[in-house]
Amino acid sequence: MPDRKILIVFGLALIMSLPRLATAQEKATPQEIIGKVRDAATALAKSVGTRHAAAGLEQFDQKQGPWVWKDTYIFVVDCGQAIIAAHPVNPELIGKDATSLLDTQGHPFFWWVCDALKKPSGIWLQYWWPKPGHKEGSRKISYALRAGDTNYVVGAGIYDDQATIAELQKLTQRAK
């Protein structure tokens, strides 16, 4: 009988820990973001300037597409026109003026993304944005990279209270 009780307790403990394991696995890492953003920038750069340019942008608007994973997604800013060009989670942002969209502290974070045009290896930036289901802003970090020689910048972000921008920039350099 004691063996059966131990198995039952162990089984219950395992079942109760599964949601925590699933949650931990669903969080994207900065390394994953760097890789996905680089892949997305390459894919977009190849389509821009061809007859497939519109399809190149549309791939980033698909909520169930390859550019949405774990707890994050790829977004695209057209820095030449200063507009949000693609956003799979908030399609109402597409076409909006990137200079007028502010984080919860009043910063034009989407416009800051365009600083990536000047940095060949991309940039990390921080801003405050509500987590899904919340109203107050939480620190969010995003990596942004220019798509080839275009005016498009591709980015993705995660909520993170720990990593510094300097640490993330070093990580980006090591990931080359």
Regions picked out by a protein language model, each given a short descriptive name:
Residues 2, 8, 14-176:
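N-terminal membrane-sensor/transducer module of prokaryotic signaling receptors
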